[in-house]
């Protein structure tokens, strides 16, 4: 069994403009290396299309907030560097990875650990797996700066990183292996299905 901390992760969260498909207006990335949560990076992004009112109601960002920010193309190399790890972590990850794939185009997404799916598998029979509920139930926002608010990328990426570490270390009072996080059973491997 492989220790989950042997892999480097980038936790990512994105916020969109509410268009279909959405343009990014904010994203944040925080590394997890050796099981330790690192320093987050965040970017505001000027989208090609305006931010819809209902999106502003969710994350609080307005068109004025991003009017003087760079377009994604101007920060793409920085973001690509921050995401250059063996694995990504996100809550409801298909939203984040889908938005990044649309922005990058040629991006090869690494292995993804979805904390929504992990929580459903590792914490069965909960009433809710919404990020906000899990944050409250496990006190994952403790000691965060007061200027951070839910549904902003800088907040969500931090609490998602804490949730991932919590899930990897607190299930039944044992640290999970990388294989267990992946949902692999003991003895599962590519070699087991090889005939020759």
Task: Label the model's feature ranges.
Residues 152-163:
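Acidic, divalent-metal-coordinating active-site segment for phosphoryl/phosphodiester hydrolysis
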Residues 1-110, 117, 124-128, 132-140, ...:
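Conserved non-catalytic scaffold segment of RNase H-like nuclease domains
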Residues 1-2, 161-196:
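Acidic two-metal-ion nuclease catalytic site recognized across multiple nuclease folds
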Residues 55, 119, 177-181:
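Generic structural signal of hydrophobic/aromatic residues within well-ordered alpha-helices
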């Amino acid at each position: 069994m492989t220790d989950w901390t042997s892999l480097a992760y980038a936790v990512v969260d994105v916020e969109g403009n509410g268009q279909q498909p959405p343009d990014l207006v904010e994203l944040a990335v925080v590394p997890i290396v050796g099981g330790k949560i690192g320093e987050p990076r965040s970017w505001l992004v000027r989208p090609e299309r305006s931010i819809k009112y209902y999106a502003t109601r969710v994350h609080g960002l307005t068109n004025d907030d991003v009017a003087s920010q760079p377009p994604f193309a101007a920060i793409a190399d920085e973001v690509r560097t921050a995401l250059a790890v063996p694995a990504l972590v996100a809550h409801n990850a298909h939203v984040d990875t889908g938005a990044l794939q649309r922005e990058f185009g040629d991006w090869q997404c690494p292995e993804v650990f979805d904390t929504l799916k992990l929580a459903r598998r590792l914490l069965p029979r909960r009433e809710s797996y919404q990020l906000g509920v899990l944050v409250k139930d496990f006190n994952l926002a403790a000691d965060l700066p007061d200027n951070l608010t839910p549904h902003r990328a800088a907040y969500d990426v931090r609490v998602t990183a804490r949730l991932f570490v919590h899930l990897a270390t607190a299930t039944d009072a044992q640290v999970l292996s990388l294989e267990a996080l992946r949902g692999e059973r003991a003895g599962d491997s590519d070699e087991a299905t090889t005939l020759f």
